[in-house]
């Protein structure tokens, strides 16, 4: 999924809730895109992109990985992988417990 930065937080919450309801045990929910991470320097291009998104729609913007991890935990998923990708993007893999 490459949509959580261009949709309201409620859409991300719905994505995780839906994944928890429909995924088989061990199946992945894979997120791709730019994120904010605690204790990690954010690339200036990602900061500018976040500002641009929020100017277009105040409900849009880069999400914090820590918040996603907490949301995953509340819905019965946990992060199993983090992969760095080109252009300061990440792949985050969550799996249903």
Predicted regions and their residues:
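S-adenosylmethionine
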Residues: 36-40, 44, 74
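Short histidine/acidic/glycine/proline-rich micro-motifs that form metal-
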Residues: 6, 36-38, 59
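Core SAM-dependent methyltransferase catalytic element
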Residues: 75-97
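Residues lining the SAM
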Residues: 1-4, 32
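Conserved Class I S-adenosyl-L-methionine
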Residues: 42-66
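A short, conserved alpha-helix within the catalytic core of class I
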Residues: 6-22
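Conserved beta-strand signature within the Rossmann-like core of class I S-adenosyl-L-methionine
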Residues: 23-38
């Amino acid at each position: 999924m490459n949509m959580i930065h261009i949709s309201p937080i409620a859409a991300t919450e719905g994505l995780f809730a839906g994944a928890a309801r429909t995924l088989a045990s061990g199946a992945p929910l894979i997120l791709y895109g730019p994120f904010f991470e605690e204790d990690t320097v954010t690339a200036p291009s990602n900061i500018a992109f976040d500002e641009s998104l929020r100017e277009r729609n105040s409900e849009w913007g880069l999400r914090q990985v820590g918040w996603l991890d907490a949301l995953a935990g509340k819905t019965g998923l946990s992060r199993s992988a983090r992969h760095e990708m080109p252009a300061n993007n990440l792949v985050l893999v969550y799996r249903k417990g």
